[in-house]
Amino acid sequence: MCGRFTLYSAFDDIIDQFDIDQFFPKGEYQPSYNVAPSQNILAIINDGSNNRLGKLRWGLIPPWAKDEKIGYKMINARAETITEKPAFRRPLVSKRCIIPADSFYEWKRLDSKTKIPMRIKLKSSALFAFAGLYEKWSTHQGYPLYTCTIITTEPNEFMKDIHDRMPVILAHDHEKEWLNPKNTSPDYLQSLLLPYDADDMEAYQVSSLVNSPKNNSAELLDAENHM
């Protein structure tokens, strides 16, 4: 699964890298070293003409859901079954997004009692994009709530040593394909959801402070040398 990530890159870098045409005021951007489910996260959609940057709550709530609690169980969608699950089939065709990040955290199991937090990033330290889906849900008061999920897939050779799942990091040339609303073939879209190139990734152990979403400072990026 993918349950924590970082996004602390400069706002202008995000705008430039993902060719964003419409976005909220720069002053509203807050870098985060410990993005967690149920938070409002940055996401990019394409409206047919422009790439738009906005905020979606992490944890997808299908339109037919009776209440928003289901969102806590839907922070991830499995790429292998995304065309089958009722909650994901519709947004796969019509409500796709990408979620910018500069690293993510995963907990590596050492034994039956011990797990250690690992920070995973690209060797280049470059920004990248998770593949995501979003939905619009109406509260009982009739207010719209926009939510999202991050898609996961089987681990590549690098990630296998850390976890049995990994988030889908889209290849750069696949980002536009994923966002393009003209692409509506479920099979084609599913074919874009591949494990990222293992040779381009690296990881290191970080402090257990990252275990709590309440902790959110640059020191979470520091390496722990206890492996």
Curated annotation (Swiss-Prot):
PTM-bearing positions, type Thiazolidine linkage to a ring-opened DNA abasic site: 2
GO biological process: one example: proteolysis
Active site: 2, 106
Organism domain of life: Bacteria
Entry EC number(s): 4.-.-.-, 3.4.-.-
Comment on protein domains: The N-terminal catalytic Cys-2 residue forms a thiazolidine linkage to a ring-opened DNA abasic site. Glu-106 catalyzes reversal of the thiazolidine linkage; self-reversal is favoured by duplex DNA formation. Glu-106 is also involved in sensing abasic sites in single-stranded DNA (ssDNA). His-163 stabilizes the abasic sites by forming a hydrogen bond with the O4' hydroxyl group.
Membership in a protein family: Belongs to the SOS response-associated peptidase family.
Protein known as: Abasic site processing protein YoaM
Taxonomic lineage of the native organism: Bacteria, Bacillati, Bacillota, Bacilli, Bacillales
